[in-house]
């Protein structure tokens, strides 16, 4: 999310000031170390820091600002850019539904939905938020999604090196509050919906545990 816009800007002949997220300090530190080794420091500078440093950075009269993140910070970026009439590209979060009907390959659709939803623990702006399926394929799709989740992350997702961790405590607490809302008490234990919920629940149970990755090992 940081490197692709940087590459585009450089390819178009621009200089770049790159500010990685403070929520992933290890990645930020790595970029600050690697970028000067491989790219001209006159063309690319990496700035580390938190909200205070970002606020100071936004006071500069850039020619263009490209921001990827949440809506709250997006508003701050837009207000700061307005002081200099700086053009802004905001790549914010959104709702991403999937629609599946009988023309789809159910196995392929299920695997792609499961992959898209759980990559980086769903912390991407294009992660599917919900699935709309026609009645003639809904049951088969639900069954295949449950299978796909288990295939990707195993019966015990916390042991999977491919299942991401939640990036900060605030987001972790928000997800924990949402978990009771997602229960389906009226469904039979063998129903496809419960099978999906069980597979998701196994993954969410892992998310709901406070591992070192949540507090000290952030990427």
List PLM regions with ranges.
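ALDH superfamily catalytic-core signature
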Residues: 39, 72-219
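Hydrophobic/aromatic ligand-binding patch that stacks against planar heteroaromatic rings
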Residues: 8-9, 56-57, 80
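Periplasmic-binding protein-like
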Residues: 7, 64-68
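Phosphate/pyrophosphate-binding betaalpha-module
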Residues: 39-45, 59-60, 68, 72-75
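Short beta->alpha connector loops at strand-helix junctions that form conserved
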Residues: 14, 19-21, 48, 68-69, ...
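A structured beta-alpha segment of the ubiquitous adenosine-cofactor-binding alpha/beta core
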Residues: 45-63
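Conserved small-residue-rich beta-alpha loop and adjacent elements
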Residues: 1-42, 85, 107
